[in-house]
C-alpha cells in the first residue's frame, strides 16, 4: 500500500512540474507579444499625430462654415490675417537669412512664422499693407440649433434551457487549451514526461502479503462495506424485466379464462437458502409493518448439521429478485416463533425452544442476538411458541407465552426481567399448555389461546378476572393455529376467530358462544395453520400436511374452498401469512422452503357489500346450527 501511495505522489509531482513548465512558457510568450505590441505603437505614433492635426483642421473649417465664413475669407484679428491654406507647391517658407533681411527693412512689419507644432508646415502672417486689403467687418449672425436625438437601440434577451454537462477538471483544462493554445513544450521535455507517465502507469501494483490480506479482510470497515455492497449487487443482478411485455393485451388472450375466474393463485416467489434453509422446518412467518416487502422466517434445528446453530431466522426481501436472504440471524436454540418488533423497524424478536426470548438488530454486524432473556424461574423455561408486540407507538409491550402456561410482558429496552408475568390456569386445575395465541384488532388486554389438549381459551391480562376466562371445546386434537378476525369495516366482526387442529378440521368460533359456529372439513391431513385476510371480511386461508393451500370465501361457499393450490413435491405446509395488503400470501413448509403466491383480484379485493353479505352468511350459519342442535336434542330421548 505504501509503494502505491509513493507512485501516486511521484506522478502528482511530475504533473505539477509539467504545469510549471507550461506556465513559464506562457509567461515568456506573453512578454514577447507585449514587446512587439509596444514597438508597433511607437512606429505608428507619428501617423496618428498627423491624422489628429488633419482632424482638428477639418473641425475648424466646419465651425467656420457654420458661422457663414468660408476658408477663403480671411479673418482679421487686429493687424494680422490668416490666409487660406495653400498647396504644397505655393507655400513659401522663409529661411533665417530672409527673415533677417526683412527685419532690416524700412520699418515695415515683416512676415512672421508661426509654428503650431512639430509639423514642418508653416502658416505665414502678413500685414495689411503687403496685400493692400482692408479689414473685414464682422456682424451678428443667427444661429439655428438643431438637436438630433440619439439613435434608439432596441435589444432583447433570449434564453434556452439546456442540460448541464458536468465535466471533469481535465476536460475543462483541455477546453481552455483550445480557446487559448499554450506554447508547445520542447520535444525533449515532453518526451521525458510522457515516458515517466507511461512507466508509472505500467508499474505493477504492489502485491499484498497474506498477513496484510487477512488484516484487511477481518477489518471492521471492510466487513461493513462488503456486507452492504454485496446486498446491492445481488439486487441488481437478480432483477429480471420482461422486455417483450405487450400492453395491447394480446398476451392475455390465452389467460382470459383465468382472469375471468379471478380466484386463481399464481406463484410469485420462492425463498430457499442452501446452507441456512436446507433440512430445517419453517416454524413461523411474519411480515414487517414498516417495510412491507420484508418477511422474517424462523427455522428449527438441522439434524444433518450438528455444528451449525440450532436456531435460524432469515429476513427475505420481496422487492428484489435476489435468491439470498437480506439478513441472517441465528442462536444456539431452535427458534419456534419470530416477529418483527412493531414500532421498531430494526428489531426482530424470537422465541426459542429453550425458553429464552432473543432480540436481533439489523444495524449490528453480528448475527447473534443483541439481547436475550435469562434462563430463570422469573422468565420462561419451556418452549415459547407465541410472541407478539401489542400496544401503541408510545406504550407497547412484548407478550410471550410458553407451553407451561406462563405469560410474560416485556419491555424491548430491557429483557433482563419481565415487567409482568402470570400463570394461565383453568379453574385451579393444571396449567394450560399454550400452542398458539391471537389478539383481536385494537385490543391489548383480551386474547385467545389454543392448547395441546384441543381446547380454546379466552383470557385477559389485567383486571379482576385476569387469566383464563372461558373454555371452548370442539376440537379432537391439539390446536395448531388460531387467529382473530382482522378486517375492519362497516360491521364489527372482532368477536370471530378461526382455529386449525390435528383433527383435520378448521372451525369458526365466536366469543359469544363456547361452541363452534361451523366446522370446515375439506382437508385429508393435519391442518397446521389458519389466518383471516386482513382486508376481506369473509376470506381466510389454511394449510395442511399434504402441501395444500386453501382459500375460503364464506360469502361464496362454506362447503368447499374458493381456491386451492398444492406446492410442488407436496411437503407439509406449517405456516401461512397474508401480506398487509391482502394481495399476496406466504406459506412455509417442512423442508425449509417459503413460497409466495399472488391472489386473484376478484377474490382478494372485497366489494362494498361484502360486510353486509358476511353478516347474512353468519345469520344463516347460526340458524343452521340452531336447527342441528334441536334435531340432535330430539334424537337423544329416542
UniProtKB/Swiss-Prot annotation:
PTM-bearing positions, type Phosphoserine: 51, 90, 97, 101, 104
Keyword Acetylation attributed: yes
Biased composition (Basic and acidic residues): 1-13, 20-43, 190-214
WD repeat copies, ranges: 277-326, 330-370, 379-420, 429-469, 474-519, 522-562, 568-607
Main localization category: cytoplasm
Record-listed Phosphothreonine modification sites: 95
Stored PROSITE patterns: WD_REPEATS_REGION
InterPro entries xrefs: DYNC1I1/DYNC1I2 (IPR025956), Dynein_IC (IPR050687), WD40/YVTN_repeat-like_dom_sf (IPR015943), WD40_repeat_dom_sf (IPR036322), WD40_rpt (IPR001680)
Keyword Zinc: no
Residues found modified as N-acetylserine: 2
SUPFAM superfamilies, sorted: WD40 repeat-like
GO molecular function terms listed in the Swiss-Prot or TrEMBL record: dynein heavy chain binding; dynein light chain binding; microtubule motor activity
Region (Disordered): 1-135, 155-214
Keywords recorded for this protein, A-Z: Acetylation, Cytoplasm, Cytoskeleton, Disease variant, Dynein, Host-virus interaction, Intellectual disability, Microtubule, Motor protein, Phosphoprotein, Repeat, Transport, WD repeat
Modified-residue entries (Diphosphoserine), positions: 51
Localisation per UniProt entry: Cytoplasm, Cytoskeleton; Cytoplasm
GO biological process terms on file: microtubule-based movement; transport along microtubule
GO cellular component terms given for this protein: centrosome; cytoplasm; cytoplasmic dynein complex; cytosol; dynein complex; microtubule; vesicle
Assembly: Homodimer. The cytoplasmic dynein 1 complex consists of two catalytic heavy chains (HCs) and a number of non-catalytic subunits presented by intermediate chains (ICs), light intermediate chains (LICs) and light chains (LCs); the composition seems to vary in respect to the IC, LIC and LC composition. The heavy chain homodimer serves as a scaffold for the probable homodimeric assembly of the respective non-catalytic subunits. The ICs and LICs bind directly to the HC dimer and the LCs assemble on the IC dimer. Interacts with DYNLT3. Interacts with DYNLT1.
Illness association: Neurodevelopmental disorder with microcephaly and structural brain anomalies: An autosomal recessive neurodevelopmental disorder characterized by global developmental delay, severe intellectual disability, microcephaly, dysmorphic facial features, and cerebral malformations including simplification of cerebral gyration, agenesis of the corpus callosum, and brainstem and white matter hypoplasia.
Protein family (similarity comment): Belongs to the dynein intermediate chain family.
Protein name per the record: Cytoplasmic dynein 1 intermediate chain 2
Species assigned in the record: Homo sapiens
UniProt gene name: DYNC1I2
Amino acid at each position: 500500500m505504501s509503494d502505491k501511495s509513493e507512485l501516486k505522489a511521484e506522478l502528482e509531482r511530475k504533473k505539477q512540474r509539467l504545469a510549471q513548465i507550461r506556465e513559464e512558457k506562457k509567461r515568456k510568450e506573453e512578454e514577447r507579444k507585449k514587446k512587439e505590441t509596444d514597438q508597433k505603437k511607437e512606429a505608428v505614433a507619428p501617423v496618428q499625430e498627423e491624422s489628429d492635426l488633419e482632424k482638428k483642421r477639418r473641425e475648424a473649417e466646419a465651425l467656420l462654415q457654420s458661422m457663414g465664413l468660408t476658408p477663403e475669407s480671411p479673418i482679421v484679428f487686429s493687424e494680422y490675417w490668416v490666409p487660406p491654406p495653400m498647396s504644397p507647391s505655393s507655400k513659401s517658407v522663409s529661411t533665417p537669412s530672409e527673415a533677417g533681411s526683412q527685419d532690416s527693412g524700412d520699418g515695415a512689419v515683416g512676415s512672421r512664422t508661426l509654428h503650431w507644432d512639430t509639423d514642418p508646415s508653416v502658416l505665414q502672417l502678413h500685414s495689411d499693407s503687403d496685400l493692400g486689403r482692408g479689414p473685414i467687418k464682422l456682424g451678428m449672425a443667427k444661429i439655428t440649433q438643431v438637436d438630433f436625438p440619439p439613435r434608439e437601440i432596441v435589444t432583447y434577451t433570449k434564453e434556452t434551457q439546456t442540460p448541464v454537462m458536468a465535466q471533469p477538471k481535465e476536460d475543462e483544462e483541455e477546453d481552455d487549451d483550445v480557446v487559448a493554445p499554450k506554447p508547445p513544450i520542447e520535444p525533449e521535455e515532453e518526451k521525458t514526461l510522457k515516458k515517466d507517465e507511461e512507466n508509472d502507469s505500467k508499474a505493477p501494483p504492489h502485491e499484498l502479503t497474506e498477513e496484510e490480506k487477512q488484516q484487511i479482510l477481518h477489518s471492521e470497515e471492510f466487513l461493513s462495506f462488503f456486507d452492504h455492497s454485496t446486498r446491492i449487487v445481488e439486487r441488481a443482478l437478480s432483477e429480471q424485466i420482461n422486455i417483450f411485455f405487450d400492453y395491447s393485451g394480446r398476451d392475455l388472450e390465452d389467460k382470459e379464462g383465468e382472469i375471468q375466474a379471478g380466484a386463481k393463485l399464481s406463484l410469485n416467489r420462492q425463498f430457499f437458502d442452501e446452507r441456512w434453509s436446507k433440512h430445517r422446518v419453517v416454524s413461523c412467518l411474519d411480515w414487517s409493518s414498516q417495510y412491507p416487502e420484508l418477511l422474517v422466517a424462523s427455522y428449527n434445528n438441522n439434524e444433518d448439521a450438528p455444528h451449525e446453530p440450532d436456531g435460524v431466522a432469515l429476513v427475505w426481501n420481496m422487492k428484489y429478485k435476489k435468491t439470498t436472504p437480506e439478513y441472517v440471524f441465528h442462536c444456539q436454540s431452535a427458534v419456534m416463533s419470530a416477529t418483527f418488533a412493531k414500532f421498531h423497524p430494526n428489531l426482530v424478536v424470537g422465541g426459542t425452544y429453550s425458553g429464552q426470548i432473543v432480540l436481533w438488530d439489523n444495524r449490528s454486524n453480528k448475527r447473534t442476538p443483541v439481547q436475550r432473556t435469562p434462563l430463570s424461574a422469573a422468565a420462561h423455561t419451556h418452549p415459547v411458541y407465541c410472541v407478539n408486540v401489542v400496544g401503541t407507538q408510545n406504550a407497547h409491550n412484548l407478550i410471550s407465552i410458553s407451553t407451561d402456561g406462563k405469560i410474560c410482558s416485556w419491555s424491548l429496552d430491557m429483557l433482563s426481567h419481565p415487567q409482568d408475568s402470570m400463570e394461565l390456569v383453568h379453574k385451579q386445575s393444571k396449567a394450560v399448555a399454550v400452542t398458539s395465541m391471537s389478539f383481536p384488532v385494537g385490543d391489548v388486554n383480551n386474547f385467545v389461546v389454543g392448547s395441546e389438549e384441543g381446547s380454546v381459551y379466552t383470557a385477559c391480562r389485567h383486571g379482576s378476572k385476569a387469566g383464563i376466562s372461558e373454555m371452548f371445546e370442539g376440537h379432537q386434537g391439539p390446536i395448531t393455529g388460531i387467529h382473530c378476525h382482522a378486517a375492519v369495516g362497516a360491521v364489527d366482526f372482532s368477536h370471530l376467530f378461526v382455529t386449525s387442529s390435528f383433527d383435520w378440521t378448521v372451525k369458526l368460533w365466536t366469543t359469544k358462544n363456547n361452541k363452534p359456529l361451523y366446522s370446515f372439513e375439506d382437508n385429508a391431513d393435519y391442518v397446521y395453520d389458519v389466518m383471516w385476510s386482513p382486508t376481506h371480511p369473509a376470506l381466510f386461508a389454511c394449510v395442511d400436511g399434504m402441501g395444500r393451500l386453501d382459500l375460503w370465501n364464506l360469502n361464496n361457499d362454506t362447503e368447499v374452498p374458493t381456491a386451492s393450490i398444492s406446492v410442488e413435491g407436496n411437503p407439509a405446509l406449517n405456516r401461512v401469512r397474508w401480506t398487509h395488503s391482502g394481495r399476496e400470501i406466504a406459506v412455509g413448509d417442512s423442508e425449509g422452503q417459503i413460497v409466495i403466491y399472488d391472489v386473484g383480484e376478484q377474490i382478494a379485493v372485497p366489494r362494498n357489500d361484502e360486510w353486509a353479505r358476511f353478516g347474512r352468511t353468519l345469520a344463516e350459519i347460526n340458524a343452521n346450527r340452531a336447527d342441528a342442535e334441536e334435531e340432535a336434542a330430539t334424537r337423544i330421548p329416542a
